[in-house]
Amino acid sequence: MRLTPFLTLTLCVASLGMAYADIAPSALETLVIQEGGRKKPYLVFAEESLRSLSGKTSVPLDGGRRDAMTIITGIWMDHSASWKEKELILVSNRPLKNHLGLDPARKLFSWNELSSNEVLPKEMAAAAETRRRDPRAKLAGLQKEASDVGMRMGMLESLVSGDSYRVIPPIAGTDWLPVNRSRDTSLLDPLQVAWAICDQHGFNRSASDLLSLQKGLSPQPPAWKIALETTYQKARPFRWAWILYAAAGIVLLLSQSSWERRGYQVAWVLAGSGFLLQAAGLLSRVLIAGRPPVTNMYESVIWVAFGTILFALIFETIYRAGTFLLGAIPVAVASLILADSQPMILDRSIHPLTPVLRDNFWLTTHVLSITLSYAAFALALGVAHVALGRIIAGHRPSDTLYTYLYKTLQVGILLLATGTILGGVWANYSWGRFWDWDPKETWALIALLGYLFLLHGRISGMWGGFGLAIGAVLAFLSVLMAWYGVNFVLGAGLHSYGFGTGGFPLVATYVGCELIFVTVALLRRNNLRA
């Protein structure tokens, strides 16, 4: 009978890859871990790690779907080479899979499968050599895709070795230590044993002991900040916001034909609730990061969605038209769905600021002004779609609708002009010159001049309301270039802190659809006039 605990432990350790199915690691959610230049809750670390590895926060594994906490904790508790046999590493690029001889229908592969591939190491070595010759070189094509896969393989190695789990504050210096390299390696033993024998109570008790020990050491981030980030990560406020916006849009559409007044009120409540949820999410990011939430593409997308609804609600408060909400909701919903569903393109992680951005005054004034102008132009885009949609449906939009569009464009131009001037002042302060024809500066100026020309044409009588609506749709393409194109397509200039990759097929599809929409509206308008 004395052999029973030993046999249980041995059998569980031997099949540790399956043990994660029987124990919940939620007791570790608020454990503080240092990663990516900052200290964050373990829950955030787990979800970000699996998202970087696999593209999602849950993946199919061993006959079931496992979430990030389960997988990342399982790797930590086990830290054995068996995890290199699991299909956890994302390879999404079809040309690369064809080049490597991998099954193009699969997206996830094991570390062992990739490391034994004869072609992948050569592509990774070529990418490394390109970077060695020129550290600023921009990888492209198969080299870039292979380099990304190599980074994921390196991340899994670091997780399996235990080096990624930096939860012990140092006595001196800035880097935290993994438990397996701390002076007291017994800290992890009770957790591992409880995990191995599937002892939920013992695991929770050991996790609580580790949390208590960590809180007694320093330096530690404020407990409220860790609790806030954990709540923010679990609440998914932006997801619930777009769901409420979508519901408001549906109610607003249905109320066009019946129960108009009551439907408008319901839509207002739903949109307002979504707005408050989104505001809470943005405020949480501000408190967690200690800065405005506009330092990368993900944050700017959710901020522009927020600004679009904000301007719509302000205009609706004044005019009670329904048009502004009807134009804003599709833009906000599409933006938030994009931010929620494309984590490999729009990185939602909170990162430390690059040196040039470490000035909250200029970050707040310049960047918020520019991005709020994008929001106003996005609202104008939505209102223009409402007007052109009526034409396509065989109705003539009222002059009032075109007046709403004109006022929205005025707000956008004011904000873009202000933001561009403030950007020049900041550039002079940071880089010693007001203007240098940097791609970001150039396209901001092109967008500003394009919208000014659009309003000038309306004032001077070169075109009427219909031309204004067509122009609002086409001019937004210049905003898209300044916002997305410079950062993700050109990838050049001094604004490198906003650079990224991916999403080009989505953007190209959007541009194509807009051109088709404008063409149909033009043809339909000619038919109506005839």
Give each language-model segment a name.
Residues 338-367, 372, 388-389, 462, ...:
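Extended, aromatic/histidine-rich regions of cofactor-dependent oxidoreductases associated
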Residues 220-333, 339-342, 349-352:
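Core alpha-helical transmembrane segments of integral membrane proteins
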Residues 6-15:
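Bacterial N-terminal signal peptides
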Residues 245-249, 302-316, 368-387, 444-458, ...:
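Hydrophobic cores of alpha-helical transmembrane segments in multi-pass inner/ER membrane proteins
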Residues 273-279, 303-308, 332, 409-418, ...:
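Hydrophobic membrane-spanning alpha-helices of multi-pass integral membrane proteins
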Residues 22, 213-235, 280-301, 344-368, ...:
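Membrane-interface interhelical loops and short amphipathic "cap" helices
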Residues 261-276, 322-331, 400-413, 464-475, ...:
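Membrane-interfacial loop-to-transmembrane alpha-helix junctions, especially the N-terminal start
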Residues 19-231:
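Soluble extramembrane regions of membrane proteins in the secretory/endomembrane system
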